[in-house]
Regions:
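Mobile, glycine- and charge-enriched loop segments
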Residues: 1-42
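S-adenosylmethionine/decaboxylated-SAM
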Residues: 30-32, 41-242
Length: 242
């Protein structure tokens, strides 16, 4: 459907209209604001189920809804494996984990995340996601993982996202994904985020296109965006192929 020019035009018009109404702020996951479109939440769920990662790395924490979503999916993987193998397990203990990075984890958000039932699967790291010291902490926290999935959703300028891709994409395992959110900024009208430094020509999509041109280990999987139609991550589903 994503190849249909008429549907594509309608989709861009709709996304532009609802973006002005802060559509992504209307949803929660297990009680925490997730700040994602429902279609992208479904896509994230599908990827986690398909890939079955040991570790999910996320840049950008905000209220923690995305961390909680990833952690809950990892919990469901544990439950599914226990059922298949006929084993019992402690649901509060898991080898799977979510690593969240944010330059400023607000105390009330940290407290809410730490009180959440999914907290045992989450580790939060405060610092710039592109600071070498922060990147080193993430690498150490992910050490030993065989299957890694990455979600990039923090600062949306070209330079920042490019640095994130250079830092975190190499951690992605073959067959898994680095998903870059808010590439849709390039497709929205100029000035759609007039209170932010990103805009057309300076955003995650421009960073993706610049980065992937030099990284043949990854390819853009457009089948996902063509299926979703409504997504904030067009050209942002990057699959590691070698």
């Amino acid at each position: 459907m994503g190849d249909d020019a008429h549907i594509g035009a309608l989709t861009r018009q709709w996304v532009s209209a609802v973006n002005a109404k802060k559509y992504s702020y209307h949803f929660e996951w297990m009680g925490r604001p997730i700040i994602q479109y429902p279609q992208d939440i479904v896509a994230m769920q599908e990827l986690i189920w398909e890939i079955k990662p040991d570790v999910v790395i996320e840049t950008g924490i905000a209220h923690g809804g995305s961390l909680i979503m990833s952690a809950s999916m990892l919990a469901l993987l544990d439950v599914s494996e226990a059922i298949e193998m006929g084993k019992t397990f402690d649901p509060a203990k898991s080898a799977r984990r979510v690593i969240g990075v944010d330059i400023d984890i607000r105390s009330h958000n940290r407290e809410a995340i730490e009180r959440h039932p999914m907290a045992s699967r989450i580790r939060m790291i405060q610092g710039s996601s592109v600071d070498p010291a922060t990147v080193d902490q993430v690498k150490k926290a992910a050490d030993g993982a065989k299957t890694v999935l990455v979600f990039l959703d923090s600062m949306h300028t070209h330079d920042h996202v490019l640095k994130e891709l250079e830092a975190y994409a190499p951690l992605v395992s073959v067959g898994s994904y680095c998903v870059v959110f808010d590439t849709v900024i390039e497709d929205l009208p100029a000035g759609a985020f007039n209170d932010r430094p990103w805009d057309i020509g300076n955003n995650p999509k421009t960073a993706v296109h610049a980065w992937i041109a030099k990284n043949s280990n990854f390819e853009i999987n457009r089948e996902i965006q063509n299926k979703l139609l409504i997504t904030v991550a067009p050209d942002g589903f990057l699959k590691r192929i070698k």
